[in-house]
Amino acid sequence: ELKSDQWKHRKLSQSWVKYLSFSLEKYHREKNENIYAFPSKLDLKEKLGIKQSEFLFDISVGLYKSFKSKKFESSKKVLPIYYQSKPIWQIESELAENTREIAIDFSKLLAGNADYAMMVSPEGKEKRDYYMDEMKKMLESNVSLGRKILYFLILPHPRDWVNKKREWSLHNWDNNDWKKVKKGEWIIKEK
């Protein structure tokens, strides 16, 4: 069965989000085994009783703690109940070139409480400049980011990922404007 281009792009984007989440989880778990990511490579349903694959953000990495359930609940056993005690990363990825969704996702990041937040959006010079200018306006009207370190990652649209060399760029908010901190290229070879 042939799949639409839109379906393929969505699957590529979802795979990329999972890869980034798994990489962040691996990096942080080397420092503390109580750090988990959503989505996770680990079986969190079996390990922690957590069934969802997303926790408020496309990617959420945080420190988890637990408390004991009470016997008066429906469960016959006293089980630990896990909760995120300290968010570390909150990431939103909107590669569908939908300005409304990018603004909604960026607003979620501004409302979040992680030390690190990142918005991922599609490239294209005009689009990139437009998105960054509009997000800058949102930041200028925001009272305070506190200690939050905010990144903006510009990636090619998934339609341009396979068999094409493409550039990406990472920008950091310096309380005044977006500053490019890193750039690179990638190419995904079709099998």
Which residues fall in each region the model found?
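Acidic-basic catalytic patches of nuclease active cores, encompassing PD-(D/E)XK
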Residues: 1-69
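Active-site-adjacent loop/helix micro-motif of nuclease/hydrolase catalytic cores
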Residues: 70-72, 96-108, 125-131
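Polar low-complexity intrinsically disordered regions
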Residues: 12, 53, 66, 76-79, ...
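Short hydrophobic alpha-helical runs that function as membrane-insertion/retention elements
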Residues: 116-122
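Domain-level recognition of nuclease-like catalytic cores that cleave nucleotide substrates
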Residues: 125-190
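Short, well-structured alpha-helical interface segments that form or flank functional binding sites
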Residues: 19, 54, 86, 100-108, ...
